[in-house]
Regions:
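Helix-coil boundary and interhelical linker segments in multi-pass alpha-helical membrane proteins
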Residues: 1-5, 31-49, 91-106, 154-163
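Generic transmembrane alpha-helix signature in multi-pass membrane proteins
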Residues: 12, 89-94, 121-127, 148-156
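Helical membrane-embedded segments and adjacent short helical loop/helix-boundary regions
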Residues: 17-21, 44-55, 79-84
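A cytosolic-side transmembrane-helix exit/cap motif
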Residues: 43-50, 95-105, 122-134, 181-194
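C-terminal ends of transmembrane helices
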Residues: 60-73, 120-129
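Cytoplasmic-side transmembrane-helix entry/capping segments in multi-pass membrane proteins
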Residues: 73-85, 105-107, 132, 136-138
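Small-residue-rich segments of transmembrane alpha-helices in multi-pass membrane proteins
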Residues: 80-92, 136-150, 196-202
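Mid-bilayer segments of alpha-helical transmembrane spans in multi-pass integral membrane proteins
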Residues: 85-93, 103-123, 146
Length: 206
């Protein structure tokens, strides 16, 4: 693969893995089998029918779980290790022919990108769950899946564009995560202090 194509594949797939690992794996595998893209190294393992089938099956479970308030956050918590590990695996498989000197750093990089997109997703979902509106989770979930599908399309058709978008996302996520952690901290602090304040108010009643 050309450098731009390889970079687009690595950056795009690692970002998408942090959002929805199973849809990413299935999408890349199908794209390879259809001849839309040639996956490098041992990454063509994703095109095995069993891998695609298992990925689609687990994606079906995630498709439902991801739209239920608080269940989505529990699912994200479980995947805090799985999604970055999946991103690392994709980088490792793609660079198997380049040797350990390249393979390991690339795997760490793709894992870090997957962790970044996962934390952004998980944090935004935790913030959304503070809202009583039940349809917000569904909208967020559909938007995320659409983003993954869009990233897979750009990996195949416009690798340079997906590379630039991932870089911009990383820059944005630094600001976003910083502010969202502050927001969630204030929300949790408010929930913890409210009962104490109410108890104190009752204790001083005559």
């Amino acid at each position: 693969m050309e450098l731009t194509n390889s970079l687009g594949l690595l950056l795009g797939s690692s970002w998408a893995s942090g959002i929805n690992l199973y849809l990413t794996v299935a999408g890349l595998g199908i794209a390879h089998r259809m001849g839309w893209i040639v996956l490098p190294g041992n990454m063509d393992t994703l095109a095995h029918p069993l891998v695609i089938g298992v990925a689609m099956l687990v994606y079906a479970v995630e498709f439902i779980a991801d739209k239920i308030p608080f269940v989505d956050s529990a699912w994200d918590s479980v995947h805090t290790f799985i999604r970055p590990a999946g991103g690392m695996a994709l980088g490792y498989l793609a660079m198997v022919d380049a040797g350990p000197a390249v393979q390991y750093p690339v795997a760490v990089l793709t894992g870090a990108i997957a962790l970044d997109s996962h934390l952004t997703k998980a944090t935004s979902r935790a913030a959304i769950n503070t809202s009583p509106e039940p349809f917000t989770n569904t909208i967020a979930s559909v938007t995320e899946d659409a983003g993954v599908i869009g990233a897979l399309y750009l990996i195949v058709k416009h690798p340079v564009i997906v590379s630039l978008l991932v870089i911009l996302f990383i820059v944005f996520s630094v600001w976003f995560l910083k502010n969202m952690f502050r927001f969630l901290k204030r929300v949790l602090k408010g929930k913890n202090t409210r009962p104490t304040a109410e108890l104190a108010g009752h204790s001083f009643k005559p």
